[in-house]
Amino acid sequence: MPAWLSALLAALGGYLLGSIPTGYWVGRCWGGIDLRQAGSGSTGATNVLRTVGKGPALLVLLVDAAKGAAAVALGSALGSPWWVVVAALGAVIGHSRSCWLGFKGGKSVATSLGILLAMAWPVALATFGVWLLGIALTRIVSFSSLLAAVAAPLLMWALGQPLPYLLFALAGGVYVIAAHRRNIERLLAGSEPRIGQKWAQSP
């Protein structure tokens, strides 16, 4: 298969996998709400947790992670770690800019975790450990996700992963941080909700 066709299939396939609007569907079917109009406006698991509940949030987390893992499988099937990276980045972008939701979506954290699990599971576990540490210290999901986004490329390098995967962690980490820009503003203002707070209860 020509390289251009492999790249196209990886990018398009990864994007379409990532764009599956899991949180939106769960919000509609389980809570009768449009997540784009509720809470933070994100369709990710954290907003589902705040606006719908724990069970639906866990479902969204698992399915969104599976989307990322499926993108890695697609890239692997195309025969090169570079196509893995292209498909993975496509999934990250697709989750936050879904063509089914007017190019809106979530923050791509769960999808990125699924990608890391399929790409380099030791890095995924270590990154998840950093996220858990952030939760234990602050109980703020966005802050913990930002810590994990910074840690992922460092852990890729420290654990000797291939260059394509290191570059994914760098690019994906920057993208996830950029997707959290409003959260960063609220963190600086001291108004970001903690776990257990409804959106309206935030300071």
From Swiss-Prot:
Gene Ontology MF, one: acyl-phosphate glycerol-3-phosphate acyltransferase activity
Record note on quaternary structure: Probably interacts with PlsX.
GO cellular component: plasma membrane
Family: Belongs to the PlsY family.
Keyword S-adenosyl-L-methionine tagged: no
Bilayer-crossing regions: 1-21, 52-72, 73-93, 115-135, 140-160, 161-181
Catalysis: reaction(s): an acyl phosphate + sn-glycerol 3-phosphate = a 1-acyl-sn-glycero-3-phosphate + phosphate
Organism, scientific name: Synechococcus sp. (strain JA-3-3Ab) (Cyanobacteria bacterium Yellowstone A-Prime)
InterPro entries: G3P_acylTferase_PlsY
Record function comment: Catalyzes the transfer of an acyl group from acyl-phosphate (acyl-PO(4)) to glycerol-3-phosphate (G3P) to form lysophosphatidic acid (LPA). This enzyme utilizes acyl-phosphate as fatty acyl donor, but not acyl-CoA or acyl-ACP.
Pathway entry: Lipid metabolism; phospholipid metabolism
Keywords: Cell inner membrane, Cell membrane, Lipid biosynthesis, Lipid metabolism, Membrane, Phospholipid biosynthesis, Phospholipid metabolism, Transferase, Transmembrane, Transmembrane helix
GO annotation, biological process: phospholipid biosynthetic process
Top EC class of this enzyme: transferase
Protein name: Glycerol-3-phosphate acyltransferase
Membrane topology value: Multi-pass membrane protein
Subcellular location: Cell inner membrane
Enzyme Commission designation: 2.3.1.275
